[in-house]
């Protein structure tokens, strides 16, 4: 097997059998002694290798050879290898860098191996002579094997030197357990000798004999150079997963299984199965040469056709078992005996992802749960994409891949594998009295609080107390997550008291509840689409965005409406004396636009979300285990109904019908934050709307529960900006640090619970629920998020179907059109580099935070009442002249006094056009935050 994989002449069909045997003996000795020390791979050596490669190409261009243009096509592989080597040399052009490259251990081994393989191919032509032109000859077969080796070498050099820069010491092994093994034994080495690798592997997985070791080497050593690279190790562990039983799986699938074909090509599979065309169910499987790390299974269909498929999201043995049960894979290589692989299906422990208190509270405030899939909002997450770490449900991932979706639906990272996971819901009882916990109605079935009613009431009271104290908090709890999800076995769960609220996870919408018209959300609107999600970008890792083009400062906001006499509904919105209807006050930018909020239209999108959707500081207490909590009342629930409408309007406005569900699992956008003035035009409304704004605001408490909605017949338009609408200013927070006490308003959690459900049902079902899976079209640049609020589409404007099968339909226009209000589909519509600009960007969402900063989970501010209209959302903002004339130096000093660096403050003010509130929001999202004051234990 080793001989055939190394492309050697086996001896029986070559030009010189005796010479072939001698070469085999020499190679065996080299294998035993170990590979020789490699010479430096300087430019001269590389150019010599190029000449040999060129000679191989010319030999393969002989018309008599009649090579088929199908993978692996050596006439494409060698030129591509040449081009990539040129790219590498261009990145190390000066003498110092070139010397560094020539001494790179991996590069030396690679060039030496490439030179030897090229010489072997040339020798093959010399010895094979006319037999090379016979398609069925052994010499021709050896050339095909060499083509496969060259193909593997090309894939490896591209993986180790992406874009020409060496990244071997940072290579990301897909399987976590395998990655731990490599780090433990080899550190950051890129390549190790086979002999060393074998000894280390034997310590973890016992290798029974030398014969087994030889066979194992022939499987792992894809480039046949007597070394094992981190790339080859990653491929092997993906092919024969799971790691815990990897050698057993390999023995069953590669050593003893009659259907396994080593180093076979697509055409050879078809040719081999052709003789079984009258025996449907015959199959063989091989390593895919175009998608290394995956299997390709060829089989004969009932009508005699030969098809080849690559199974997704499951180990090979599971794919073979499923295919056998369905009648597709019955006769391996035409044989009647089909091995029973069910013994490999022993249940393996799932990754357990534990929801922290901060994550739990944030999701409650947004009306959802961490474990809910952000794409369909119906199923719980049960699979993790590797290596990016995004979480979703299996059905969504399968549908995405079957719709030809490329890579992760959120970040477009290559899907190298999947891992089953279980999300352990947060149980407040586990936290004791150290923190104020919010009961998650969607995780209640797992908490079973029916026999702990006293506990439940106590939790609700604690939550209410924390809401009342939220004005004293210095940081908004609704901040972005700080890290990726880590399985419990891979990283210990941080103490909830030590987790900063900067590491809170993104929030999904409850599309399933909205579509069914069920008011289960504890805090209202699932308006946040991943595109407009406030919690998407990693604060610590993301640089401040470039300042946007200057826009005029917004005029002062209109006067706050006169106080409304308290009644049963009013009292639920006022938790202290300075309260006003919360709908008049938007969510603070810090709270709703945490890192990602500053894409050009996100700040305003966050405001709309802030008004109609769950607020930080508002927690889920409306539904406890399917029942209303003691803190809620029928009137409160009725109040919630009224608040459905606006958030849904805001939700659809966010991205032309694309709601928050998409952003929550998407890597952060790094689009520059627009000044508030850039956002204000987008919220300026038409005359009819503007005229009724203040009146509607004043009538908030008295109106019926189902009346609260911006009329869909008056879409908010950028082009329609009456002078009386120019009063719109950025939202004012009674707390400058991003708390949700907007205008001193506090909404009860139950008010917000249902706030957006009716309208969201329209938009989430029609558009957002299915846009969460981005198309495979190239994503547009981040600024495409401008129309977050710029155009408020009528409920019926969605053009996408709402069936589950349409979940992955691609939109016709991936880019935002300012005139038409078209907005890109959320999850993947970003420039290719967007998803990786932050260190954790591709795995930040839906992942457990790994950082902690010694502060308890922050108290959640109260939930303001929904704002009615755009102009009145900024009541407590300082009035025009005072804000406009405020000294810039004073603002800088104030922000620096909060713990931010001078350069960060200066840049943030420049971006915000000297708006203190927006600058503070930007700093919260993009700069390291000041220390958080500890929350009170209640």
UniProtKB/Swiss-Prot annotation:
Q: Where is this region: EF-hand-like?
A: 168-240
Organism equals Rattus norvegicus (Rat)
The organism that produces this protein has a lineage beginning with: Eukaryota, Metazoa, Chordata, Craniata, Vertebrata
Q: In Gene Ontology terms, what is one molecular function of this protein? A: ubiquitin protein ligase activity
**Spans annotated as Linker:** 344-372
The region called 4H is annotated at 35-167
Q: Where is the composition biased (Polar residues)?
A: 473-486, 714-724, 839-855
Q: Where is this region: SH2-like?
A: 241-343
Q: What else is known?
A: This protein has one functional calcium-binding site.
Where the protein is mainly located, per its record? cytoplasm
Compositionally biased, Basic residues: which spans? 862-878
**Disease linked to the protein:** Lack of Cblb expression is the cause of the Komeda diabetes-prone (KDP) phenotype, characterized by autoimmune destruction of pancreatic beta cells and rapid onset of overt diabetes with no sex difference and no significant T-cell lymphopenia. The KPD rat is a spontaneous animal model for human type 1 diabetes mellitus.
User: Which EC number(s) are documented for this chain?
Assistant: 2.3.2.27
In this chain the UBA domain maps to: 887-926
List, as start-end ranges, the regions of compositional bias called Low complexity: 794-804
The Cbl-PTB domain sits at: 35-343
Q: Does the keyword NAD apply?
A: no
Q: What GO terms describe the biological role, i.e. biological process, of this protein?
A: CD4-positive, alpha-beta T cell proliferation; cellular response to hydrogen peroxide; immune response; intracellular signal transduction; negative regulation of apoptotic process; negative regulation of CD4-positive, alpha-beta T cell proliferation; negative regulation of epidermal growth factor receptor signaling pathway; negative regulation of T cell receptor signaling pathway
Assembly and partners are described as: Interacts with SH3 domain-containing proteins LCK, CRK and SORBS1. Interacts with LCP2 and ZAP70. Interacts with CBL. Interacts with SH3 domain-containing proteins VAV1, FYN, FGR, PLCG1, GRB2, CRKL, PIK3R1 and SH3KBP1/CIN85. Identified in heterotrimeric complexes with SH3KBP1/CIN85, CD2AP and ARHGEF7, where one CBLB peptide binds two copies of the other protein. Interacts with poly-ubiquitinated proteins. Dimerization is required for the binding of poly-ubiquitin, but not for the binding of mono-ubiquitin. Interacts with EGFR (phosphorylated). Interacts with IFT20.
Q: Name one Pfam family in it.
A: zf-C3HC4
Keyword annotations? Calcium, Cytoplasm, Diabetes mellitus, Metal-binding, Phosphoprotein, Repeat, Transferase, Ubl conjugation, Ubl conjugation pathway, Zinc, Zinc-finger
Record protein name field? E3 ubiquitin-protein ligase CBL-B
| Post-translational modification note | Phosphorylated on tyrosine and serine residues upon TCR or BCR activation, and upon various types of cell stimulation. Auto-ubiquitinated upon EGF-mediated cell activation or upon T-cell costimulation by CD28; which promotes proteasomal degradation.
Concerning PROSITE patterns, the annotation shows: CBL_PTB (PS51506), UBA (PS50030), ZF_RING_1 (PS00518), ZF_RING_2 (PS50089)
Subcellular localization is given as: Cytoplasm
């Amino acid at each position: 097997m080793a001989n055939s994989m190394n492309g050697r002449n086996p001896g029986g069909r070559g030009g010189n059998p005796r010479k072939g045997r001698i070469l085999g003996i020499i190679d065996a000795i080299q294998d035993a002694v170990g590979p020789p020390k490699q010479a430096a791979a300087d430019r001269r050596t590389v150019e010599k290798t190029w000449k040999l490669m060129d000679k191989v190409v010319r030999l393969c261009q002989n018309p008599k050879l009649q090579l088929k243009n199908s993978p692996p096509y050596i006439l494409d592989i060698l030129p591509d290898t040449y081009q990539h080597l040129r790219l590498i040399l261009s990145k190390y052009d000066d003498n110092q860098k070139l010397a560094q490259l020539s001494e790179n251990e991996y590069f030396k081994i690679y060039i030496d191996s490439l030179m030897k393989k090229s010489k072997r191919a040339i020798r093959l032509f010399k010895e094979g002579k006319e037999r090379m032109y016979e398609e069925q000859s052994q010499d021709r077969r050896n050339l095909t094997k060499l083509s496969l080796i060259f193909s593997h070498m090309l894939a490896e050099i591209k993986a180790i030197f992406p874009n020409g820069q060496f990244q071997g010491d940072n290579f990301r092994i897909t399987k976590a357990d395998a990655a731990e093994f490599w780090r433990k034994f080899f550190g950051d080495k890129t390549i190790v000798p086979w002999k060393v690798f074998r000894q280390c592997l034997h310590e973890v997985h016992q290798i029974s004999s030398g014969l087994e070791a030889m066979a194992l080497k022939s499987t792992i050593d894809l480039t046949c150079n007597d070394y094992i690279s981190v790339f080859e190790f990653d491929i092997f562990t993906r092919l024969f997963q799971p790691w815990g039983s990897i050698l057993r799986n390999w023995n069953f699938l590669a050593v003893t299984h009659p259907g396994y074909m080593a180093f076979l090509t697509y055409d050879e599979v078809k040719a081999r199965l052709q003789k079984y065309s009258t025996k449907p169910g015959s199959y063989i499987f091989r390593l895919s040469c175009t998608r290394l790390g995956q299997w390709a299974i060829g089989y004969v269909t009932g009508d005699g056709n030969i098809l080849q498929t690559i199974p997704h999201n499951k180990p090979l043995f599971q794919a073979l078992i499923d295919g056998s049960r369905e009648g597709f894979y019955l006769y391996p290589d035409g044989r009647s005996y089909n091995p029973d692989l069910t013994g490999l299906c022993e249940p393996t422990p799932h990754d357990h992802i534990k929801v922290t208190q901060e994550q739990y509270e944030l999701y409650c405030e947004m009306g959802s749960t961490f474990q809910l899939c952000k794409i369909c909002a119906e199923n719980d997450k049960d699979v993790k994409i590797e290596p990016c770490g995004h979480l979703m449900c299996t059905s969504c991932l399968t549908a995405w891949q079957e719709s030809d979706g490329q890579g992760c639906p959120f970040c477009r990272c290559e899907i190298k594998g999947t891992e089953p996971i279980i999300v352990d819901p947060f149980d407040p009882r586990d936290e004791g009295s150290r923190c104020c916990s919010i009961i998650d109605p969607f995780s209640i079935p797992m908490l079973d609080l029916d026999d702990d009613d006293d506990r439940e009431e106590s939790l609700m009271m604690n939550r209410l107390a924390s809401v009342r104290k939220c004005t004293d908090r210095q940081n908004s709890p609704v901040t972005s997550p700080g890290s990726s999800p880590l399985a419990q076995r891979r990283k210990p769960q941080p103490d909830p008291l030590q987790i900063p609220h900067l590491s809170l996870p993104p929030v999904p919408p409850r599309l399933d509840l909205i579509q069914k018209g069920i008011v289960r959300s504890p805090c209202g609107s699932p308006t946040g689409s991943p595109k407009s999600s406030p919690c998407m970008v990693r604060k610590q890792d993301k640089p401040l965005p470039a300042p946007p083009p200057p826009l005029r400062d917004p005029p002062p906001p209109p006067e706050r409406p006169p106080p409304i006499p308290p009644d049963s509904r009013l009292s639920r919105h006022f938790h202290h004396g300075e309260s006003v209807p919360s709908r008049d006050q938007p969510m603070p930018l810090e709270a709703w636009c945490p890192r990602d909020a500053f894409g050009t239209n996100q700040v305003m999108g966050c405001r709309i979300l802030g008004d109609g959707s769950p607020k930080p500081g508002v927690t889920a207490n409306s539904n406890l285990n399917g029942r209303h909590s003691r803190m809620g009342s029928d009137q409160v629930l009725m109040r919630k109904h009224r608040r459905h409408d606006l958030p849904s309007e805001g939700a659809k406005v966010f991205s032309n019908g694309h709601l928050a569900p998409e952003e929550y699992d998407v890597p952060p956008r790094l689009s520059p934050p627009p000044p508030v003035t850039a956002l204000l035009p987008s919220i300026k409304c038409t005359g009819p709307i503007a005229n009724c704004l203040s009146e509607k605001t004043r009538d908030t408490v008295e109106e019926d529960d189902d009346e609260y909605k911006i009329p869909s017949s008056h879409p908010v338009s950028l082009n329609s900006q009456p002078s009386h609408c120019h009063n719109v200013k950025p939202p004012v927070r009674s707390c400058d640090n991003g708390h949700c006490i907007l205008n001193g308003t506090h909404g009860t959690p139950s008010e917000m619970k249902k706030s957006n459900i009716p309208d969201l049902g329209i938009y989430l079902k029609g558009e957002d629920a299915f846009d969460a899976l981005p198309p495979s079209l190239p994503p547009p640049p981040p600024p495409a998020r401008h129309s977050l609020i710029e155009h408020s589409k009528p409920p019926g404007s969605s053009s996408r179907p709402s069936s589950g099968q349409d979940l992955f339909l691609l939109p016709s226009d991936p880019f935002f059109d300012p005139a038409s209000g078209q907005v890109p589909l959320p999850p993947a519509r970003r420039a290719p580099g967007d998803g990786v600009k932050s260190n954790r960007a591709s795995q930040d969402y839906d992942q457990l935070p790994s950082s902690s900063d010694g502060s308890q989970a922050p108290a959640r501010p109260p939930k303001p009442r929904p704002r009615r209209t755009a102009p009145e959302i900024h009541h407590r903002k300082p009035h025009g002249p005072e804000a406009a004339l405020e000294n810039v130096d004073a603002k800088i000093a104030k922000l620096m006094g909060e713990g931010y660096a001078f350069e960060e403050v200066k840049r943030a003010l420049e971006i915000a056009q000297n708006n203190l509130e927006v600058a503070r929001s930007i700093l919260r999202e993009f700069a390291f935050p000041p220390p958080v004051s500890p929350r009170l234990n209640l």
